[in-house]
UniProtKB/Swiss-Prot annotation:
The protein's name in its UniProt record: Homeobox protein 2
Coiled coil: 835-865
Subcellular location: Nucleus
Gene expressing this chain: hbx2
Region of interest: Disordered: 32-149, 161-494, 537-580, 609-942
Record-linked Pfam families: Homeodomain (PF00046)
Amino acid sequence: MNIGSLLHSSMLGKQFQSNQSQQEVVSNNIAECNENNNNNNNNNNNNNNSNNNNNNNNNNNNNNNNNNNNNNDNNNNSNNNKININESSQSITETVRSPYSSPSSSISSPSRSPSPNSPASSSPIHSPIPNTNFKQSGEYQSIPSPQNIHGLNKKVKVDMLESPNSSNSSPSFSSNMSPSSSNSPRHRSNSTSNNKSLLQYQFNQSNQSPSFSPLRNNKNNNNINNNNNNNNNNNNNNNNNNNQSPSMNGSPSSNLSKSNSGIPPLQLQAPSNTSSPQLLSPNHNQQRISPNRYLNGGNNNHNNNNNNNNNNNNNNNNNNNNNNNNHNNHNNNNNNNNNNNNNNNNNNNNNNNNNNNNNNNNNNNNNNNNNNINNNNINNNNHNYNHNQNHNHNHNYNNNNQNNQNNNNDDNFSPSHSPNLSPSNYNSSPTHYGNNNNDTPKRSHASYKNNNNNNNNNNNSNSSFDEYQPQQKVSRSNSPNNDKEKKRRTRLKKEQADILKTFFDNDDYPTKDDKETLANRLGMSYCAVTTWFSNKRQEKKRRGDVAPVQTGGRRVPIDDEDDYENRNGDNSPSRNQGGAIELLKNSSSGLTPILESLNVKQQNNINFFKNNNMDNNNKNVPHLSLSNNNNNNNNNNNNNNNNNNNNNNNNRNRNNNNIYNNNNNNNNNNSNNRGKNFSDSGSSDSDSELNRHNNNNNNNSNNYNNGNSNSNNNRNNNNNYNYNNYINNNNYNNNNNRQHCDDEEEDEQYFNNNNNNNNNNNNNRISDSSDDQYFSDDTNNNNDNYNNGNNNYNNNNNNNNFNNNYMNNYNNNYNNNNYNNNNSYNNSNGNNNFNNNNNNNNQNNNNNNNNNQYNNNNKNYLNNIPSSKKHQLQGNYERRNSLPNSQIQNNFNGDNNNNNNNKNNNNNNQNNNGNGNNNNNNNNDNNIYKRRHSMDDDCQQN
């Protein structure tokens, strides 16, 4: 069986084992694979979801075959990103079988290790396959990696096999990745200095439960996929789908060695005590690391790399070109195209990949993912820069820093360490600007101009830079929010107060010229002088000592200088007493230097304000850029950068970003969300709910950063209008679920539970009627399925994070979800696991409360709904009487199985979803729930 047939079978929704990739690559089958992929990819979003599951599975399967490849591709495509994490041991031109079919079953912790009969252990994927094409033969041994007391992998050493064809001691298995052309630089894998840097795998154990170890599942794969995602995202945001397919195989956490190979081993060590991923210096070792190549043959990986490169070059055309070389790339490109057509469903997936990486960074579930995520974010930023050219590189810059911060990577780059971000300063080097041999990581978005992820890899975990916080407020002289400035404006110096008071005693209605003169002499603004006189007149009036004779018995307009001559000012002291201006001229000469200095300071403040305005236009301060739904949010959504690019193009939400301070999350959803500003609809209670859920949104943005599903969660964040925690169920489904909690009992909300996360953003429709609101919850598990594998635990994290925001139980749920995701992932060896994980993630959204909550709509609600209230509306709409919050909570606390089943509504299909068949998602799409709510039962969940 060749890879083409594997892809074909996987597109049919079959579970196929991830490491069939050792099969030989036959170029004649590429067309068939591309057709299958194209057909599947050209299906509906749900099909795309299923295909994404397949593509994601294919991407995942191919990623299983190509997860490493995607990562490798990212490494290769990123012009050999400094981190070539997943490098296949096979080249496309060679029919070399991968020496390792999969990681050892010891990836999972002892408490969760699969049984001998489980797919993870019994699958031939995990059986070592000798490499038949290397000149030196040897027995390959899979040695279980030691684990710490938490069940997490300790430092791992990986002995890398070196291809006899490699040069400069680089384990590049083929200098030419393209089967068709040996001279095509697009398909050429550089085996020189770009391959020098190593990604030092690591993950933070501080945030993980003893039983949870997302990294042990697909540490390398996730990283690689993230790298691919970065490349693809940077290129098309479509290729991200291809790249995004999470690696379905567990990371090679065990010591893999070849006996009698005579080849020096390449050691990959990851300290477990640090939270931010770090890159080894480019000079540290010239051997490229590709742990996933043991898992997945290098053919697909190289293909994905080509795709990434091609995608980076032509985005889509290159993908087609890559199709000749890459089954997965072609399909993925098609998927990406479909995704772009579908409001970038795949892009959302891509965003999920990036987001997953970002989320992983935040979740520290996959430090490698963190690295990849940073790469993705940076690449996305670069990608945004290329596409948007809206100073996105500046935004990206801030975003990268911001994402790193969000991702717990503390990648804060000081402006002194960052290059000039103007396009003219971008180095034409395909890898990154500056000296490639410099151990100091460089800002990578600058190289994104060439669609390079290397800088991202280099930037991933460099916490040594000086901390730069773009969120720092800029002092503005006219800003009422600045306390110091406010005090300075309102508290006058004694000399100023004396002069103004003396003038006021003579004339309480100075002319415009008088006020201008006072302002200039006192170093005050004209407005400040006018306000002072106005306040003084009001104070005088309150004291009752107003002299009506001076005003002719009528109230004089406060600041109407034009009517000065029309006032009865004949008795004005300034006029009758020779003018008050002389008072200033005759004032103490000692005041002049002080007043002049104040005046100079005033002018400096004005100039400073003007300059800062220009700087702020160039600098995208994330927390100030929410109003810019497309560009700034994308920048803010560095995690969403890929999605943001697509979403930014698609952003139709007027106010969502503003409503949800979820910069990243809102961007994805906002871009696709067509719903009007929720603050415009509903009662003041709904506004208060919005305020409450802005926190959720903020959490969502965190969730977004936390996991791939966060892109979905981003949608969820947008849709996490669901003021009721139970809506948060599904985290993903919540994406579309926007629930307004109005105090009107007649308000009805319809949830079209279409688990198309991608489609959700695209399909989110909200009626303007105050009575009924329809929510199309199109959270296709594409993103989730797409996230299957790498993204799965990310999704779990997202769901968990999401649930964490909503539920107090989130900690337990979070651990359960992550734990389950990892387990499901491990159980299914990746492909099925990805889907299952996605489903599990979507349903692990269980978070036990969230999914259950959501499932409350799906199942628990059904149980709780009186039969007299049931009716039909387009599909199965279920009317739900107001339930006590406690009852709803109980429903939410419903079984996770119910969540899975309820959420999919086609419970069985959910397993299929795990198989990569997004039937459940489709079913979910068909499921619509009508729910009546009141402030007492739903809205008031404090």
